[in-house]
Amino acid sequence: MCSSGQISESEQLQLLEKLEVVRISGRDKRGRKVLRIIGRYFPSRLVTAEALKKYLEVKIFPKLSRKPFTVVYLHTGVQRSDNFPGISSLRSVYDAIPANVKDNLQAVYFVHPGLQARLFLATFGRFLFSGGLYGKLKYISRLDYLWEHIRRHEVEIPEFVTDHDEDLEDRPMMDYGIESDHPRAHTAIMDSPVSTYSMRCIS
């Protein structure tokens, strides 16, 4: 297993920039900026909470401090062992968000949550986040529902997300964890920049 201690903080920051885990991309239908987060791209084995906080402080928060914005979080394909930073790290990152940025956040669109994510947030959501933020969370099971709120052609959506969305249309029970993901979803993981970097680190 790779550990974050094997790469410096500057390398961690460069990795976050390269993978575009967190990026301001497009606007919603009210003209507000959209902060897009791709959960599957977050290399939790390589990047510490401190490095993530520094990246957000330098690259993201200054762009969100003055006007309202929304978040689109793509949970598609997230693996707990590879992409989940841990409860304490999530809380630490949330606590580091400046008050004016929290106030400007209007909605969090949680795309492809799945049963486990819903249960996790139902159990720990109010512990991790303030009631105000938790109340802004909106589950989005299909991309078509996202486009009711977000300008479709302004927010870049990775191909593996659209592929998974098509699978859900054909096999809706996947939403509830009753069916496993389509094999092509697993194949796509090997093509992601996270996997490439991780395999390089392991070797």
What are these regions (language model features)?
Residues 1-203:
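Basic, amphipathic alpha-helical/coil surface patches used to engage anionic, phosphate-bearing ligands
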